[in-house]
């Protein structure tokens, strides 16, 4: 049975503010930086997020496996009692060169080129199309849920909502065909 095209209400939540200080001090790079926990401000943001009325309308809570998203999701799970699923494929957008400078340059190129990767690009990164495919393939297993809270990352969320800037712990509701 072909099940493509089922609409699921996704309540996107960007993770709280992370604290990279300890990892940067120890020269962590790439996915090593994804071990960063929330900052004190990020924890306050996550606690405030738990008061959002939309969260209680969901059937399931899904989180990226990145520490900052998972820590944010832990607050939501405790406050709402929603079952939590962790998805490693809902990670942050990938830039294939190390360093914050390269990340910011890649982000500028990504935005300038509407998510495409030009053949002569000086930095390699995951395209918008690749991110969408990764997301949809990962989320296919949740088609039987009407409403899912998804704690994830700005660049991934931006592929489905028009906001260019998505604040920490911002809640954005949308229907997505999965």
Residue ranges and their predicted role:
Residues 63-67, 89, 151-155:
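Short, well-ordered beta-to-alpha junction loops that form the rim of enzyme active sites
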Residues 22-23, 32-37, 78-134:
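Phosphate-handling substructures
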Residues 9-85, 172:
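Active-site-proximal alpha-helix that buttresses catalytic centers in soluble enzyme cores
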Residues 1-7:
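Short, Lys/Arg-enriched N-terminal segments with co-localized hydrophobic residues
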Residues 21-26, 73, 96-100, 162-164:
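Short aromatic-enriched loop/helix-cap "lid" or pocket-rim segments at secondary-structure transitions
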Residues 14, 88-90, 175-178:
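Residues at the C-termini of beta-strands that transition into short coil/loop
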Residues 70, 133-178:
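Active-site-adjacent alpha-helix immediately C-terminal to a catalytic or transition-state-stabilizing loop
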């Amino acid at each position: 049975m072909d099940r493509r095209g089922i609409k699921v209400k996704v309540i996107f939540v960007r993770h709280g503010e992370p604290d990279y200080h300890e990892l940067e001090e120890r020269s962590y790079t790439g996915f090593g930086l994804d071990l960063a926990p929330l900052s004190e401000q990020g924890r306050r943001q996550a606690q405030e997020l738990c008061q959002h009325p939309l969260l209680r309308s969901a059937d399931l809570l899904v989180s990226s496996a990145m520490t900052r998203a998972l820590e944010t999701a832990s607050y939501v799970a405790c406050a709402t009692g929603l079952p939590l699923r962790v998805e490693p494929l809902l990670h942050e957008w990938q830039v294939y060169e190390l360093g914050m400078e390269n990340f910011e340059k890649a982000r500028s190129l990504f935005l300038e080129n509407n998510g495409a990767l030009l053949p002569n690009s000086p930095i390699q990164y995951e395209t918008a199309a690749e991110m969408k495919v990764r997301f949809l393939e990962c989320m296919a297993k949740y088609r039987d849920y009407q409403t899912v809270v998804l704690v994830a990352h700005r660049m991934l969320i931006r592929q489905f909502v028009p906001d260019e800037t998505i604040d920490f712990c911002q809640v954005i509701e949308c229907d997505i065909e999965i």
